[in-house]
Amino acid sequence: MKIKYSRTPHLPFSQSITSDDKKLISVDHFIGKEIIMSEKRDGENSSLYRDYNHARSLDSSDHISQHWLKGLSIRYDIPEDCRICGENLYAKHSIHYTNLESYFEVFSIWNEKNDCLSPNIFFNR
């Protein structure tokens, strides 16, 4: 099953919000909870499956940056019912990244029930 990644809202105090961005009204629901923050990159949100990959939109048009991503995804043995989501930084957007370890940065992995796996699995805690 192919699943569209939902939009991530900006924090209310973000300085880079555009007219089509969603933003949180408040951050009060984070008070007293452990949170993990990551840097927002200027790329293309992409999902990798064992036999398929797509941008955030399930029907996104073909682009050379997706060819690179497909080549990357076939190098790994992704479990049948899982998907790996991350930012595809291969194509140049408003920011041109250099000196990256990879043009694909993973930010979440989802199981067959569409549950996001705990980051504790990936980070030494």
Segment roles from a protein language model:
Residues N45-S46, N111:
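Short hydrophobic/aromatic residue motifs in ordered secondary structure
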Residues S38-E39, A55-R56, C85-L89, F107-S108:
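Short His-Asn-centered micro-motif
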Residues D59-I64, S94-I95, N114-L117:
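Short, surface-exposed beta-strand/loop "edge" segments at domain boundaries and coil↔beta transitions
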Residues M1-E44, R50-D77:
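Active-site-proximal "nucleotidyltransferase
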Residues I31, L69-S102, I109-N111:
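Non-transmembrane, aqueous-exposed alpha-helical and coiled segments at domain scale
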Residues L48-Y49, N114:
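Generic hydrophobic alpha-helical membrane-span motif
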Residues L100-R125:
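Extended, acidic-biased charged interface segments
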